[in-house]
């Protein structure tokens, strides 16, 4: 069977961008699916990769899908920049039946399977369309049938119809944030996007992961106000920076009391999510209300 690479809009000019038409029938039915969002640079790839390892250490079969054109979501798992789905398809002129699994799937640390969706050139195309084609390709090769957990690591805090497309496939959306104004402001916008998508899809907010923060007071105050909950807290430790430079997950770093506490927190988070995190019925604030709500030390 071929993947139908078709233009999802009725027309396209010489210059401009495609918009994605989401397919409500394209579902991942055999795995628990999590989509990880958050402000750009907040540590979503670090969080996603270490969470994937934690799931794998629970004995689960894990697939991580990077949804950023930079295709750097999984490098701490694979120790290299993995080939992207879009590059693999272009190499065979989009004849997907010519692709082998190893052309676009890389096995990473502790058996985590890694896929980088990639994306169109900057300023053209729709990244969400690429995500949809990635899921179709994985289904065509029956890879999702042998998977227990799928983790989507999603570009920045972009909540357009395209990069919101992983929400079509997800059971729970997780938001990574720090204890600062900009991160929480971005989180509120993501809450609004997920709230809108939940009207048409089964995705629900799973909760908040506090990252790179010594304290969580502002996060907790915001959560209480809108109806969110904090699932985990990871402080800003130098070992995290060093793990990225070593192209390694935290589970591969030399043991220390502070590192052991972090990996234990990842294991606890994975256990909580696998057991079934209750959805959060959060209501986002209006931007001006949030501006007045935050800060004022």
Swiss-Prot record:
ATP binds at residues 41-46, 70, 211-212, 235-237. The lineage of its organism: Bacteria, Pseudomonadati, Pseudomonadota, Alphaproteobacteria, Hyphomicrobiales. GO terms for biological process: light-independent bacteriochlorophyll biosynthetic process; photosynthesis, dark reaction. Mg(2+) binds at residue 45. [4Fe-4S] cluster binds at residues 126, 160. It comes from Methylobacterium radiotolerans (strain ATCC 27329 / DSM 1819 / JCM 2831 / NBRC 15690 / NCIMB 10815 / 0-1). Disulfide bonds: none annotated. The gene is bchL. NCBIfam families: DPOR_bchL. Its EC number is 1.3.7.7. This is Light-independent protochlorophyllide reductase iron-sulfur ATP-binding protein. Belongs to the NifH/BchL/ChlL family. CDD domains: Bchl-like. Keywords: 4Fe-4S, ATP-binding, Bacteriochlorophyll biosynthesis, Chlorophyll biosynthesis, Iron, Iron-sulfur, Magnesium, Metal-binding, Nucleotide-binding, Oxidoreductase, Photosynthesis. Binds 1 [4Fe-4S] cluster per dimer. Pathway: Porphyrin-containing compound metabolism; bacteriochlorophyll biosynthesis (light-independent). Its cofactor is [4Fe-4S] cluster.
């Amino acid at each position: 069977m071929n993947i139908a690479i078709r233009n999802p809009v009725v027309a396209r000019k010489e210059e401009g961008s495609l918009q994605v038409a989401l397919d409500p029938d394209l579902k991942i039915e055999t795995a628990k699916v999590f989509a990880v969002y958050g402000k750009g640079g907040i540590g979503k790839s670090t969080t996603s990769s270490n969470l994937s390892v934690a799931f794998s250490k629970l004995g689960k079969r894990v697939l991580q899908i990077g949804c950023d054109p930079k295709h750097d979501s999984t490098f701490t798992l694979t120790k290299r920049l993995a080939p992207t789905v879009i590059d693999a398809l272009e190499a065979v002129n989009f004849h997907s039946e010519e692709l082998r699994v190893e052309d676009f799937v890389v096995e990473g640390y502790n058996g985590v399977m890694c896929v980088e969706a990639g994306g169109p050139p900057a300023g053209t195309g729709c990244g969400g369309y690429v995500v949809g084609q990635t899921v179709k390709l994985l289904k065509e090769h029956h890879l999702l049938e042998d998977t227990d957990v799928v983790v989507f690591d999603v570009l920045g805090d972009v909540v357009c119809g395209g990069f919101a497309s992983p929400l079509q496939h997800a059971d729970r959306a997780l938001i990574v944030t720090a204890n600062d104004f900009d991160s929480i402001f971005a989180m509120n916008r993501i809450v609004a996007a997920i709230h809108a998508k939940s009207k048409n899809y089964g995705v629900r907010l799973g909760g908040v992961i506090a990252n790179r923060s010594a304290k969580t007071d502002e996060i907790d105050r915001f959560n209480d106000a809108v109806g969110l909950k904090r699932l985990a807290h990871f402080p800003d430790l130098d070992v995290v920076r060093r793990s990225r430079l070593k192209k390694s997950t935290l589970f591969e770093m030399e043991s220390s009391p502070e590192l052991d506490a972090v990996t234990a927190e990842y294991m606890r988070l994975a256990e909580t999510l696998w057991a079934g995190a209750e959805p959060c019925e959060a209501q986002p604030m209006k931007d001006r209300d949030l501006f007045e709500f935050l800060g004022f030390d």
